[in-house]
């Protein structure tokens, strides 16, 4: 018939236990006959769909209407194939799939009838159809064979005798077949089921990780179905023979998935080999069928690799041959088996394209016999032609094939390489029966027999071997005759052979002691009832009596397997002889069976422990030991039964007869007593132990005496030296000079400053507790808690008081002794579910973490019952949540807790509202009653209602839920401070103060009026507002005032607090400039002016003369505080109220009524009036002079912002970036390959610093042979960044140019090495990745000479870079669109006077285009609409800015110093379970300290702004009427005002000096009172600076031209820095001569103010080292040390990333030295650097000015002398430059960008020249 395609079906099974335990997901979808698979690794990818003949959905339960049962599969596939078999076609069904996919279940099924597979159902229906046949002319016969292919070897599963591997042969007619494979005739389905069961038991299975009963072999169950029909008319019979092949393939597998090892791995390799070959065959057949219609010419690729595997060889006819074939692909639905399932689907899809040409097998036997006869005739003719006709001239069909000739042929074949046959049947008399194939006798055989005496076997063999092709012809003739005899075998003979094989199998099993049921099923193992036998005894009781050996009648031989005679019992071992012993079983006269043991010569055989050399009669129960290891017990059932009958009362032995009994018996009989031996051995060991112990004790005692003697000698030496040292110290003490008071003050200042530094301790806390924070977040994510944890720093300031529960215990004890607040590390808990934020201490975090772990463990135990989203989790024992109520307090403070909590929770009257002498008005009564009523509603406490029913609440016996805290309704909006200095004069003032949050954010403004009133004065009527007419009395007791815990007078002054509130070491504004004596003098001056000391005690000298009559000591004074309005408060706060209190009375507060907030429209009118009466004391006067009233504004959220963050349940916490912009990633240096490993040397004192401007270029080889710089893309717009646009596969060179100012210490010697590595496609560096490091060949390194006389140094080196040596795909291919390649470059350079190389590291960004691509730089939007992009060749470079420090090597120091340098383990890198769910989140590190520092400075600035605004408002209100004494009393406020906010004392000096320099006459902005208020030190410095400035500018700026005459403006570039301020002659204008104070004070402070300035690359351990104080040095180190002195410096280079904030950009004109021309350049100010470009389109930085080391000078006299308006000067260490702006406004903007303080001072001076009228 015509070709038909292979029918393909797929079937998906349910999840197995392994997949269920791993919570696998189903990735298979079926719709009709279409099957789709989803990629679990990329769910967004479209599913892959396949179409098959059948798609069976068996993943669900049978109740599913789409479920495909076993019967449905058989009805679709099996019935159709059975019908084809009855039609006469060959049929094949095979199952394919991965291991454990359900192939064996589909093909074989299970024992239950409803779960039978295709094979049992097909066999059963086959015999049903046969039995239902009513045609008498039809007869049927069924033959079955069952084989397995295991490790490419074929085994017969039905014949127990065929234990070896069968050979696969190929016959020209039959094709591939298995030689000697058993074909058993069956007459019923029961016979087939029995054979199938027997074969399945013999099949090889094993357990793997993916399948507990994995089929380790391919099984082929073959049914030969013959239909014979007798035609009565013609009396001819016709046959149709169908071959039904049912194949169960072994599962494909991967070693890593199945965990295969050893034998399992070898099996899997063979399985995969055969399945791979099967796939190749299927693919080849599919391609052949596809190409048949297109091209009929056979190609070389049409070869089908059938012979590559035994499986495909045997299935050749079934795959694309004469067969109807069906394939069932078994699928696993689990996502963890995605790759295997997809491979199976592709196999099945290819198999659909195979076409088989099946034909009906009409009478195959007759045709086959005829063809075989022709083949035999042809072979005989061939032998006769070769002269062997006398040997084979025999009719093969005249006799059976099983005679003695068969043995001859076998012997002949096995000995064909010998000349003599060693067999008993080869005597000359028997040679007549040894015909070829044992066919019938013939005249030829008689002639052969008559010539027996003359012809020998040797001659016949010689004739056959010597004849060409004779051996092969004999072999093929033998095969053909064997097949003919098999075909001519009648059906009855086949049945008899099958029955004989079955009887042999049962006999063999019975001989082994295995009982068989009547139906042929195995019953079990039994102990023989009559036959004597041996059972083994083993040391392991479980292994005893597992082996049973029968002693047969007659002789039973025991020996080794390689003995000459066959041994009945085969043993192995070193002491087992080839023939060890003989058991002789005979019957005596009485019929009793007697067994005698006869040992062979020199064999070791023991009976009951005695060695026997002569025959011994055995009794039942005797112990027999053969050799040394084989122990048996002899059992004689009949003999034992007879003895029990004779002595029925015989007691059973008290000890069981086992292996131990036999061994002990053997030792006893040989005279060895084990107990005695053990006791003897034990005594010997005890004696040995005692001897060794005595020796050890003696040795220990001797060592102790030796050490004691040494210690005594050392003690004497120490005492002697200590006496000498004491004598020396006494002498030295006599010579010491006592400290002066000034020296004591210096020591006290230094100790207090050292004690306040907390950088290291805070860093240790952050690093040491990071692992706890990470674990808490990981548990929160895994339990789906919407709670995030992150570190936060809290400092107890006026704006941000720290709750006492967050302070450590030891800190609380020493709090009163500490003059300035401490900073604590806390944990910010963001409850995204409830919209609340809490702060936990580290101890509380650790306590809660224990409960979290317990909760996590419980969740794992009862995961199915977890109710994360239920209501009970809000108030249950959940350690993630603090107790949350409907109203919350965010950022609580002691003041708020003290006033609100006490007023709302405590019902006792407040002393503020009820005192002995005060009259509480009705409004006050109403307020108090309202507050008492409000007490029941302000706090929602549900701990007693349902906490007991929550999980874990029963753990706490005290009834309090430890997971929740009480939180009040209102949250703190912000705080404001109002000073009371106007009460000194007294004048009324209305303040508009900023409401500042704890984070330094302005949340609104508050208008407050403060005025002194008479005692009986009525309050004004504000309309509908509140009118409070009562008077509250507040006491200011001197003793209580001094002892109370609030900021002291010294702390409230910014001059001290700004310095003392520093938490980072060396971060004080004046830390690098102001010496301790200057600091102490400043403190003393401030204290003298304010009338206070450091300890807070009052020194009120001349008090009565300085204050007015209204503030007499002891008198009553009344003043009024009116809260007018609040404005600018965000609408998210619903209700707003305000309360205020005094600092020392934080528990007594005055509160307004809440008002509805309608947004940013009209302000909220409180109009709350409060009269306050006090008794005038020294404390009160000092308070109104120096301290404010605290105003706190509260509200509650309508909807908390955290709710928006909590909408995503499983989002991991993100790192906080509140203040600093995201820093650009900087890589560590690439390790050198040619240099020794350099350790990070501890850096000591810094000798000098330089700014380096480095240009990086990558040049490519052009067709002209020159190397041209590659194009650089600068569209990012940020400085020091750019992308190299390179061509693929072109030679390149890397050029690096270093530019810096000339210095005596800095000389480049050579480039030691240039290395590149860390190739990646993302900016971040993967530290775990292993990348090849390539060292480049340096071709040139030299210093360049500038075209003009320049003071800068240009050092350039060039290296060859072959990118192919990296062997990186990223560098070898064209970069895909949108991707960039990053590479790290490190240059190791050698410097003079340095002990190790300096390292310059740069991350280079690249994009590779095709080799012939034309590359042009992209144009940004700005350039697109502008005048074009700069195409200058020198624009193709990337810039880097570096800071080079030349430092001394740090001394190891004292042990205390070494302890302070301890290495703290950063636990943030430690792994915790579940960390991978955090998606890259990390705990905050050292940067948090810097952010908090900036936060504190921001709060301090806001505070100082309010103080200054108050002072200016008061001064404007008083006008010129302010007396001198009152002006002096206000000086503390002035000294701590804006001038001291962002600068240090030196900045004030400079400002004053600058103003004096501008107008040295009496027409200065300050009047004579201001000048007289300067202290002597300030006057001295001001005079010195004035002289220098006046002297210089009177020279008409000539010295400026002289100092910079050796360079042009184009040379302005990196400025060499030195932390010192060098001294120069006053005759020359230099940076240090004109600005000695601002170099390291004002500019450095502004540098520190800007976060971008601190974005340097540093490791976690180095993050704080860059902020160390650099000691001042007066002269260059090399000049001081002398040129002949050998110097050992350590270079330290750090890359500096410019800030992203642009302060100002535009064009400026630069004055060229010694020239009247001005050069125009484009300037961008990114603090602390000024970047200079040729134009606004120039992308490359041509020069930089470091503002932290430069001085900006401005003088109107200078402009008048030079006749150049709008000019100012910038002085650096090496040069001075004149700059000119476009107009006056532009100049002010540039001055503000360069130096904000200078610009503010100028504006203030200009505003004072034209004073405005005072406003009231």
Swiss-Prot record:
GO terms for cellular component: axon; axon cytoplasm; cytoplasm; cytoplasmic vesicle; dendrite; kinesin complex; lysosome; microtubule. The modification N-acetylserine is found at residue 2. It comes from the Eukaryota. Residues 470-512, 672-731 form a coiled coil. Keywords: Acetylation, ATP-binding, Coiled coil, Cytoplasm, Cytoplasmic vesicle, Cytoskeleton, Isomerase, Lysosome, Membrane, Microtubule, Motor protein, Nucleotide-binding, Phosphoprotein, Synapse. Its main location: cytoplasm. The keyword Transcription does not apply. Residues 1640-1659 have a biased composition (Polar residues). CDD domains: FHA_KIF1B, KISc_KIF1A_KIF1B, PH_KIFIA_KIFIB. The modification Phosphoserine is found at residues 1054, 1057, 1416, 1454, 1487, 1573, 1603, 1610, 1613. It is found in: Cytoplasm, Cytoskeleton. ATP binds at residues 97-104. Residues 431-450, 1550-1570, 1620-1659 are annotated as: Disordered. Gene3D superfamilies: 2.60.200.20, 6.10.250.2520, Kinesin motor domain (3.40.850.10), Pleckstrin-homology domain (PH domain)/Phosphotyrosine-binding domain (PTB) (2.30.29.30). One of its GO terms (molecular function) is microtubule binding. Its EC number is 5.6.1.3. It is an enzyme of class 5 (isomerase). Residues 1701-1799 form the PH domain. PROSITE patterns: FHA_DOMAIN, KINESIN_MOTOR_1, KINESIN_MOTOR_2, PH_DOMAIN. Residues 432-450, 1620-1637 have a biased composition (Low complexity). GO terms for biological process: anterograde neuronal dense core vesicle transport; anterograde synaptic vesicle transport; cellular response to nerve growth factor stimulus; lysosome localization; mitochondrion transport along microtubule; neuromuscular synaptic transmission; neuron-neuron synaptic transmission; organelle transport along microtubule. Has a plus-end-directed microtubule motor activity and functions as a motor for transport of vesicles and organelles along microtubules. Belongs to the TRAFAC class myosin-kinesin ATPase superfamily. Kinesin family. Unc-104 subfamily. Monomer. Interacts with KIFBP; positively regulates KIF1B microtubule motor activity. Interacts (via C-terminus end of the kinesin-motor domain) with CHP1; the interaction occurs in a calcium-dependent manner. Interacts with MADD (via death domain); links this isoform of KIF1B to Rab3-carrying vesicles in anterograde synaptic vesicle transport. This is Kinesin-like protein KIF1B.
